[in-house]
Amino acid sequence: MQVTSQFKTVALVGRNNTPGIAEPLTALASCIAKRGFEVVFEADTAAEIGVTDYPALRPAEIGARADVAVVLGGDGTMLGIGRQLAPYRTPLIGINHGRLGFITDIPISDMREIVPQMLSGNFEREERVLLEARIMRGGNPIYHALAFNDVVVNRSGFSGMAELHVSVDGRFMYNQRSDGLIVATPTGSTAYALSSQGPILHPQLQGIVLVPIAPHALSNRPIVLPDDSKVSIQIVSGREVNVNFDMQSFTSLELGDTIEVRRSRHTVPMLHPVGYSFFTTLRKKLHWNEYPSHEEDSKP
């Protein structure tokens, strides 16, 4: 079949260590290939499920060769491959094979119908921002990473509170004693930040949210900053303080270290089915608009 879509090569990425994922991945590959698209697999995914019929590529090779990546997994899978493909601006399509699925929005039961439609051009596109962070020690950068959801400075499970000196654009904001601080993108506002009583930011809102984790002072509240802000967090006191990036990679910190966080120049293009609504996602995932029936109200 002749392909007339803007997409020619489609990469498939699967959630690692997931029993039963081989069947839907290979079925989707066959479905896409029959429509004339070239199909490639992410190398770790191919090795895990034993795929040999399609090329197996590393993320950098996918970025250079594929026109779109279809991700079958949970939000964590999407975050991981999204960070790696962001420099290549490879669009992502997410199929939910996890639990919550805020950014993998296509039900696995509908993938064979919806994904081919999207590859044929029937989709809605949006750009999701990333954060970039670097750790400064003694005035020198020692670590650098991207984050799709959030950069989290926090204490380990058995240590006391950490004291953090926080400034924005070089201006002192506050000293905070807490279990940590979350710096989140709008995408990340529905992740760890939400469970720490942070606000939900619409994905198209240009902002960065700071959310304290169990602060000592109840007056320490979340705050939304302009997305061109530079946030600096210095470790004043505390034992075993770490910084996590999307809760998928981390590094240990020392007293005096400073974490500098700002919006990355990279964005992640995400494709959704026609009719996609962020508010529908919130209703479904957070169980909004669900009220007990009158019968339930009348039960003793």
Swiss-Prot record:
The keyword NAD applies. The active site is at 75 (proton acceptor). Its main location: cytoplasm. It comes from the Bacteria. Its cofactor is a divalent metal cation. Its EC number is 2.7.1.23. PANTHER family: NAD KINASE (PTHR20275:SF0). HAMAP family: NAD_kinase. Involved in the regulation of the intracellular balance of NAD and NADP, and is a key enzyme in the biosynthesis of NADP. Catalyzes specifically the phosphorylation on 2'-hydroxyl of the adenosine moiety of NAD to yield NADP. This is NAD kinase. It comes from Paraburkholderia phytofirmans (strain DSM 17436 / LMG 22146 / PsJN) (Burkholderia phytofirmans).
